[in-house]
Amino acid sequence: MESWQEDLLSAFLVVKNEDELFEVVKSTASKLGFDYCAYGMQSPLSIAEPKTIMLNNYPQAWQKRYIEQRYVKVDPTVQHCMVSLQPLVWSSQNAKTQEEKDFWEEARSYGLNVGWAQSSRDFIGTRGMLTLARSTDQLSEKEQKAQYTNMYWLTQTVHSSIAKIVNDVEFSQFNLYLTNREKEALRWTAEGKTSAEIAQIIGVTERTVNFHLCNSMQKLNVNNKISAAIRAVMLGLL
């Protein structure tokens, strides 16, 4: 695990509420080269009244405009993240319709020129979406490749951290015993290794590695191996 990732996890481990957590997100976004960030999450623990959290440091005028015009219904990042876990790079240049173009041009007038968005969700149905934005420069393909791992790691870590705060889940309710093989697979996953690479390192088949990772994901109540590694670290299991 890189020192950047370790520092991020350490910071999230000591936050006590959503506001403290978002301060860490803002600081991290700045280090990644973004002026603005936003995180939204909906918890399904109450079917009648699902809890929704919206945190951002966008200009106040844009926040007001966004709410008044109900832009959540036309915001392409929201529409994308409702149906996909894949990251989306956005700007007015990527607009597919005139409505989208108008939306992005207005956002640009408030300093939101280009950005990156990705959703996340877990097994209990908590959905989250992280957006990073800035007022200058396009996101080049080179920058996207260089920063992808960091931005993906931030998305998963934020979701795991804030879901724990909002849902107030006692993790002791779940089966948190991990076998040595499961821990080993998660440690190497945290180092950025693929299942095939882990298989070579520990001397088992790729299928066996995936078996251990799937078991870990179920025990830790997450839906991907990166989230499993993050949660295991945060819970002191590795």
Swiss-Prot record:
The keyword NADP does not apply. It comes from the Bacteria. GO terms for biological process: quorum sensing; regulation of DNA-templated transcription. InterPro entries: Sig_transdc_resp-reg_C-effctor, TF_LuxR_autoind-bd_dom, TF_LuxR_autoind-bd_dom_sf, Tscrpt_reg_LuxR_C, WH-like_DNA-bd_sf. PROSITE patterns: HTH_LUXR_1, HTH_LUXR_2. Belongs to the autoinducer-regulated transcriptional regulatory protein family. This is Transcriptional activator protein AnoR. It comes from Acinetobacter nosocomialis. The gene is anoR.
